[in-house]
């Protein structure tokens, strides 16, 4: 589900009324049962916990976690968490610890897409962090955030997946380049309207998973299955780098489904 809310039950989060959820949520016990049910059928469930964007459920309770103390909708997307506040990383590490305790999957998906950076630009704290790290762009600052989460997951013996927005910080292969996403992060390609993304992903050393919004998002009732079955993602990857292709994913977003029958 791509709505900015948590649908699991983190034990340490103090909920604030009904501002964070709609439509209910899964308890940890329910999720453990779901993981076991899937495992018995040789299916591994990989959780996605979005950050630093799509986090309105967090900022509704902890507005101090944003760069400006603002917990609202921005110009296009929700206001993201601040990459310059240590308490944000501490909080997210607690969340990820609980997620990893429930989901034994090798991979953890952290989102990292659709991050509106206006509040970062307004924040003296964010600008100071950029100066200290030698970054020239706010995309590099996003990569810094993602890399810190990536390193934490690796310390815990897990691998990280993120959306392709996270590659915009720079190229680690450029001498002296700063702000690049760690090459050991797996990247899901979804921004089909941005030219050259798949090739850039693999040229920066990442494994890639194809799930371009067109045609791989099946939320649209008019989406033709023919285009999914005949999608040729390998045509976008140089022959010498095709070993970095993990595979593909057809994406169905739960909030766009009104009932199970429509999902089926």
Give the ranges of each region predicted by the language model.
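Substrate-binding cleft of carbohydrate-active enzyme catalytic domains
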Residues: 1-161
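Flexible, acidic glycine-rich loops studded with aromatic residues
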Residues: 162-167, 175-185, 192-264
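Short Asp/Glu-rich motifs
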Residues: 56-58, 172-173, 220-221
